Amino acid sequence: MSKIVVVGANHAGTACINTMLDNFGNENEIVVFDQNSNISFLGCGMALWIGEQIDGAEGLFYSDKEKLEAKGAKVYMNSPVLSIDYDNKVVTAEVEGKEHKESYEKLIFATGSTPILPPIEGVEIVKGNREFKATLENVQFVKLYQNAEEVINKLSDKSQHLDRIAVVGGGYIGVELAEAFERLGKEVVLVDIVDTVLNGYYDKDFTQMMAKNLEDHNIRLALGQTVKAIEGDGKVERLITDKESFDVDMVILAVGFRPNTALADGKIELFRNGAFLVDKKQETSIPGVYAVGDCATVYDNARKDTSYIALASNAVRTGIVGAYNACGHELEGIGVQGSNGISIYGLHMVSTGLTLEKAKAAGYNATETGFNDLQKPEFMKHDNHEVAIKIVFDKDSREILGAQMVSHDIAISMGIHMFSLAIQEHVTIDKLALTDLFFLPHFNKPYNYITMAALTAEK
């Protein structure tokens, strides 16, 4: 029986552990260390919880220590791994305040990512910990369950009068949190160093639609501004950028995440951003040591190269692949496209692959084709929304490189999966134009927006 130690029980770790226990549990001894107090928190639902769009946090968990141990794993919670002896294959962790050593035959990292803290006067990070302390009260970041719980508890305390909130970071998490706070009746300003929201996921003509959507719901946008300082007498009172000052009562830092790979200790090859560099079997540069989820690289089918794309969906898939290979059952990942989506005040946006800007930066002779239309025929008077689509493709090979869609009709969310598969399988824009897409007035038009965008593509 092989002994496998898993460091981290986040989404990737949980997927990995469950896959091993469900399929190869009789063949392996599984030992898990995690520095957190809970398992499987769905951070993507955090804004819904904070904004009171769901009843509570209970449904945001799908596993726990007891469930994993019932299947046969040994799980140590609140037990950070301190060091790893790769030569002798020994993990040293802190368990109940004491040093604990665990030998292994195979090792899997599922250490996830840690929030990026930009250089801001007034904020101090505690090195080596996923938490941070600030020199001012009410400077928050949101990554873990307890982070969100702390924000909710503070907002629930009416004596604190936390009515004005600044969210720093205009990515998915920042935009979702801005909506959540506005839904609570707070005065919200969203600050980002770039001049648009959702930068990197969509081209600017699409991001402008989301920016207008936010402003239409009374969220102030302070884009193209760099945060310089957070000031106050014991508590947050104002946020200072390179262009203006905002009187606020709370600051949320949501500027992104970096891979948590401190345990590499100079022994494992890392990607340019510090992630564990892995092959298609999720194996690192040390044989028998694997990495899955946000701490590891992925193969990007749009770029045809190794990349870093931190998404829960990627975490689950890489966890499955890593589990099979660690257990001696060969399985290669098929790569990713970075498919993603967001829904803010009923405006739904989805994308996959590369934006036009990213495609050009990656060296492609890229161009785009697009189309705007109703989802259904004009005679369908109810629940018939406008849809905008953009398809990015390479002029030379004609291969589809990316797609973006936006609408108040949530049905577009399923369409992006087709484009994800198209990128994975190197489908051309010309083949897409003749792809068999069904028609029924309840769903779409005979010449629907996907077909029309492909048919009108530059030859």
Swiss-Prot record:
The modification Cysteine sulfinic acid (-SO2H) is found at C44. Its cofactor is FAD. The keyword Glycosyltransferase does not apply. This is NADH oxidase. Its EC number is 1.6.3.4. GO terms for cellular component: extracellular region. Pfam families: Pyr_redox_2 (PF07992), Pyr_redox_dim (PF02852). Binds 1 FAD per subunit. It is an enzyme of class 1 (oxidoreductase). NAD(+) binds at I173, D192, Y201, G256, A310, G341. It comes from Streptococcus pneumoniae. Catalyzes the four-electron reduction of molecular oxygen to water. Plays a role in redox balance maintenance. May be involved in mediating bacterial adhesion to host cells. May be considered a potential virulence factor. Disruption phenotype: NADH oxidase activity was almost undetectable, regardless of the growth conditions. No significant difference in H(2)O(2) production. Dramatically inhibited growth under conditions of vigorous aeration in vitro, but no significant difference in growth under limited aeration conditions. Significantly reduces number of mutant strain 0100993 bacteria recovered from the lungs in a CBA/J mouse intranasal infection model. Significantly reduces number of mutant strain 0100993 bacteria recovered from the middle ear in a Mongolian gerbil otitis media infection model. The keyword Repeat does not apply. InterPro entries: FAD-bd_OxRdtase, FAD/NAD-bd_sf, FAD/NAD-binding_dom, FAD/NAD-linked_Rdtase_dimer_sf, Pyr_nucl-diS_OxRdtase_dimer. Signal peptide: none annotated. FAD binds at C44, A110, T111, G112, S113, D294, A312. GO terms for molecular function: oxidoreductase activity.
